[in-house]
Amino acid sequence: MEELQGYLEKDRSRQQHFLYPLLFKEYIYTFVHDRGLNSSVFYESTEIFGYDNKSSSVLVKRSIIRMYQQNYLIYSVNDSNQNRFVGHNNYFYFHFYSQMILEGFAVIVEIPFLLRLVSSLEEKKIPKSQNLNLRSIHSTFPFLEDKLSHLNYVSDILIPYPIHLKILVQILQFWIQDVPSLHLLRFFLHEYHNWNSLITPNNSIFLFSKENKRVFRFPYNSYVSECEFVLVFLRKQSSYLRVTSSGAFLERTHFYGKIEHRIVVRRNYFQKTLWFFKDPFMHYVRYQGKAILVSKGTHLLMKKWKCYLVNFWQYYFHFWSQPYRIHINQLSNCSFYFLGYLSSVLINPSAVRNQMLENSFLIDTVIKKFDTRVPVITLIGSLSKAKFCTVLGHPISKPIWTDLSDCDINDRFGRICRNLSHYHSGSSKKQSLYRIKYILRFSCAXTLARKHKSTVRAFLQRLGSGLLEEFFMKEEQVVSLIFPKTTSFSLHESHIERIWYLDIIHINDLVNYS
C-alpha cells in the first residue's frame, strides 16, 4: 500500500498550476501560428471569409484586449447564437476569436503532458532520433509481425466514448488543477455543443470535426488514456502480465511514449480479479478509438477480459458500453482491420521427410506468418464518400476541383495516389492497389475532361497519357529514392517484400475516412 501511495504522489507532483494566465500572452498564439497546423484558424478561417493572413496578428491583439473585459466571451457566444444570420462580419469576428482561443487553449493544456514526456525521455536517456522513429505508425507492424504469429486469440475493441461531456472534464482534473482552465474547457464543450446543434443534427460529429479536433480530442484522448490505466496497473501488480501500449494523439500531436503512469483507485477491487488475468503472452496496441488485445491464452480468458472491460467502463465512467463493440476471434481463422491494413495470421503446412538408418518417416510442420493486405473494398468505400468514384468503384469527375489549373488537378490526384502507395508499402500483395490507382487516374482524367468540356477519350487522345503518367510515381521509383544504388535490394522485389517506413506519423486521410 505504501508503494501505491508513493506512486500516486509522484504523479500528482507533476500536475501544473496557473495555466489560465497564458491565454493572455501573445506569444502563445504566435507559437500556434508558426506551427502551421492544417486546421488552424490562422490559415483556414481568414481565407474563407476573404481576409488577409497578415491581419491575424492585429486580430490577436484585439482579442486579448477584449478578453480582459468581464464576461466578454459569454456575451459574444450568446450574441452570436441569437444573431448569427444577421451580420457577416460579426459572425466572422466571433468565429475567429473563438477559434483562436480554442487553438491557444489546446496548446496550453498540452504543456503538462509535454513536460512529462520530456522528463521521461531524459530519465530513460532515449535518443531523439529513436523517439522519432517510435512515432511512426509503421513501427507498430514489425512488433505485430514478431508477436502475433505465436498467439492464438485477438480481441477487436472499439473504445466507447462517454455520452456526457462532464466525464471528459472530470478526468482532466487528475492532471490539471488549474480551476479557471477547467471551467473554460467546460464552457467550450457546453456552449459549442449547443451552438453547433443549429447546424449539425448529430452533435457527436462536432467534437471530432477537423475544425476543432485539436482541443476537443484532447479530453477525449485523456479519457482513452484513462481507460488504459487498468492494463498498466495489472501489469505492475502481476509479474506475469506484460502489456505494451502506445497511444496516438491528434494525428500530428501525439502521446507517443510508452504509457506507464496512471491514476489507480480501489486496489482491493482489483485484487479479486488478478488471479484469472495472468497471462505470460498478452499484448495491447491502440490507435485513436480502435484497439486490439491479443493473447496466447484460451477463449475463456478472452471472454473474461471482455466482461471485465465492459463492467469497468460501466462502473468507473458511469455509462453503458455495448458488448458487441468487442469481438473475440481466433487468429488462424479470421482477419482484423487495424491501421488501414487487413491483417491475419496465415498457416502454411509442410511435410519434411526424415530418414534414420533404414527407417524413414514424415514430419508435419506448421509455419505461421503474419500477413498484411490492402482492404480494397474499404478503400473504394472511402473513395466513394470522397466523391472520386461510385459505390461500385466506377471513376467519376471531381466537379469542385474544375476551377483549379490543370497542373494543380494533376498534382492533387498524383499526391493522393503516391500517399496511398507509400502508406500501403507494407502490403504483401501490392497488385491490389492497381484498382485504386485506376480509379484515381481516370477520375483525374474525367475531371480534366469536364473542365475542358470534352469527353475522357477525346481528351486523352488529344493530350496523350503522358500528361497523367508523370504524376503517378511508381513504387519502384519511390524505393529507388530511399535505397542507394549499391544495395542488393532488387526493385522488382518491392511488389513482394513488405517495406515499413519510419516517417509516417499519422494515418492516411482516405484510410481513416471510413
Swiss-Prot record:
Origin, by domain of life?
Eukaryota
Plastid recorded as keyword:
yes
Question: Which GO BP terms apply?
Answer: mRNA processing; RNA splicing; tRNA processing
> What parts of the sequence cross the membrane?
none
Q: Localized where?
A: Plastid, Chloroplast
A Pfam family matched by this chain, by name?
MatK_N
Residues annotated as coiled-coil are none
InterPro entries according to UniProt: Domain_X (IPR024937), Maturase_MatK (IPR002866), Maturase_MatK_N (IPR024942)
Sample GO molecular function, one term: RNA binding
Does the keyword section mention Plastid?
yes
Q: Which GO terms describe its cellular component?
A: chloroplast
Q: Which UniProt keywords apply?
A: Chloroplast, mRNA processing, Plastid, RNA-binding, tRNA processing
Job of this protein: Usually encoded in the trnK tRNA gene intron. Probably assists in splicing its own and other chloroplast group II introns.
Q: Which family does it belong to?
A: Belongs to the intron maturase 2 family. MatK subfamily.
PANTHER family linked to this entry: MATURASE K
This protein is called Maturase K
